Amino acid sequence: MTETKQTDAAAPRLTSLSHGGGCGCKIAPGVLSELLRRTAPPALFPDLLVGTETSDDAAVYRLNDEQAIVATTDFFMPIVDDPFDFGRIAATNALSDVYAMGGKPILALALVGMPINVLPHETIAAVLRGGEAVCADAGIPVAGGHSIDSVEPIYGLAALGVVHPARVKRNAAARAGDVLVLGKPLGVGVLSAALKKDRLDAQGYAQMIATTTKLNRPGTALAALPGVHALTDVTGFGLLGHTLELARGAGLTARVRYGALPWLAGVEALVADGVLTGASGRNWAAYGHDVRLGDGLPAVAQALLTDPQTSGGLLVACAPEAVDDVLACFRDDGFERAAAIGEMVDGAARVDVS
């Protein structure tokens, strides 16, 4: 999916207008936890199947015995300079949270903040067209939205989906013995940092766009597999952060095999050369005390494992006998690099990497 480039030579680079980009814009997990602790505990609503308790990907509200609504919102500042690609990435990332609950998207609303007197109107329109193109690919309308004049460019979606109440996939239901399966290769944050430093070649940019604009559609089909116990997506807190959420939610230890992890081409060399995001360090500071990195890992391991993923892959915890079906579900939708990367075992709520 491409759009003919009609760039305005006088227009500033989108990434030059923001202090962060993509899911690297997220408030650091430690700070976010502290902020939420200062708010009132949520009231009890019997039909609210998923709320804020386990930092899950979306809210789920039961309408009746056959239907529940999945509701989520996601927006961020530019991770790339091409406005159409920015819109596509942001929309793909927002819809991922619906898929991560096992849901099927049905509707989106656009969330738009733009420096209206700085960016050409055609640039802003291209962002909107990018988001609409992804929603069309997902089979849903962008049915409205809200816009403001802001200092930094911001775009995203509020998205609604549907799921059967019995098929909701939480991030807190993994079981001892489950195998962890990852849907997409890692390293988007590193590539985005390289882009901002003019260190990313055309091939690197192409692979970044390909992975960040690929809808996590398998989530809907995974919800129908009884052997799938827990589901989330890997975004701003990096692989370690979101795996740790699975471990904490289940009260188990997650074991990750570093050698089994799929990486985007070139990211290890870039990190070795000092190209990484500030969010990587903030992530480690927030949760590194609950992670054990084994001896013999490469020097770049910590930075890569905490690298913030924008529009990252689904992370599945499933019974061992369901692994082949889970991998087939991914590969039937073109996720050729989906891989089993570890397992859940009895033990303290932490992540061990070997």
From Swiss-Prot:
UniProt-annotated catalytic positions: 23
UniProt xrefs under Gene3D superfamilies: PurM-like C-terminal domain, PurM-like, N-terminal domain
InterPro entries xrefs: PurM-like_C_dom, PurM-like_C_sf, PurM-like_N, PurM-like_N_sf, SelD_I, SPS/SelD
Reaction(s) catalysed by this chain's protein: hydrogenselenide + ATP + H2O = selenophosphate + AMP + phosphate + 2 H(+)
Feature type site, description Important for catalytic activity: 26
E.C. number(s) listed in UniProt: 2.7.9.3
SUPFAM superfamilies associated with the record: PurM C-terminal domain-like (SSF56042), PurM N-terminal domain-like (SSF55326)
Origin superkingdom: Bacteria
Names of the cofactor(s): Mg(2+)
Keywords noted in UniProt: ATP-binding, Kinase, Magnesium, Metal-binding, Nucleotide-binding, Selenium, Transferase
Job of this protein: Synthesizes selenophosphate from selenide and ATP.
Subunit composition and interactions: Homodimer.
Protein name as catalogued: Selenide, water dikinase
Organism from which the protein derives: Burkholderia pseudomallei (strain K96243)
